[in-house]
A protein has these predicted regions:
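Acidic/histidine-rich catalytic neighborhood of metal-dependent amide-processing enzymes
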Residues: 1-30, 236-237
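Metal-dependent amide/peptide-bond hydrolase catalytic core
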Residues: 32-237
Length: 237
């Protein structure tokens, strides 16, 4: 705006959608945890604090939230996602010195993927309350024990629009009039939050992402190339 440039009307995010017009995705966020325990010989574990045991309590809390969310009847908005509930997941964890020493430190990363109906601030507040509860119990044994939680990425969800400019453009070019949403996150939510209509449309399948042999088929690559050419042509008309 300061440079006098016009605001974009639409954003097309080229993440893998099999060239379908995806109008919604879950929001996501993450916390990096560093838990400081208190090391003692495991024969006297009642006098120490195992950072790994305390990490397990937080991870089990996340599992309980998953079970609760799964048991809920999804709202119409949530029902279109797969799975139709908010999920919490730990994909990295490390810690400990030896099998016979209570772990002095444990690190792990917890991610969340939220359906549009769930408020990330509410989930974050519940997590922080659980952290405070566990930390207080740890410090009854060892005052130096700590749970340090650093907030990582925060990706807003993409909420389906009613015939937004981006959706209209992509549907006109692809001929895809079906409803599609995904559970992975993209930059689309950021564009939408900034007031720019956004959708996802790109070559490839998310099932091949983050694999040792990650790939995009030649047919999908060619379809993506043809799509971009048509987008350019439509803007030049």
């Amino acid at each position: 705006a300061e440079a006098g440039l016009p605001k974009a009307e639409a954003a097309i995010i080229g993440e893998p959608s099999m060239m379908e017009c995806v109008t919604g995705h879950k929001g996501s966020g993450a916390f990096s945890f560093r838990i400081r325990g208190f090391e003692v010989h495991s024969s006297l574990m009642h006098t120490g604090v195992s950072a790994i045991h305390e990490a397990a309590r937080l991870i089990e809390w996340a599992n309980e939230r998953n079970a609760e969310n799964r048991a809920k009847t999804p709202s119409p908005m949530a029902a279109i996602f797969n799975p139709p509930w908010t999920t919490m997941h730990v994909g990295q964890i490390s810690g400990g010195t030896a099998h016979n020493i209570t772990a002095g430190e444990c690190r792990f990363v917890m991610e969340m993927r939220l359906v549009p109906d769930d408020d990330p601030e509410v989930l974050t507040a519940a997590l922080r309350a659980k952290i405070a509860e566990i930390e207080a119990e740890m410090q009854k044994v060892a005052p130096s024990a700590r749970i340090i939680a650093a907030k990582g990425h925060d990706v807003p969800g993409l909420v389906p629009e009613e015939d937004g400019p981006a959706e209209q453009l992509v549907r006109r070019i692809t001929g895809d009039n079906a409803d599609h949403v995904v559970s992975y996150g993209t930059e689309a939510g950021h564009f939408q939050a900034a007031g720019i209509s956004a959708v996802i449309c790109g070559p490839g399948n998310i099932e091949q992402a983050h694999q040792a042999d990650e790939f995009i088929s030649l047919a999908q690559f060619e379809a993506g190339e043809a799509f971009l050419s048509k987008v350019v042509d439509s803007l030049c008309d």
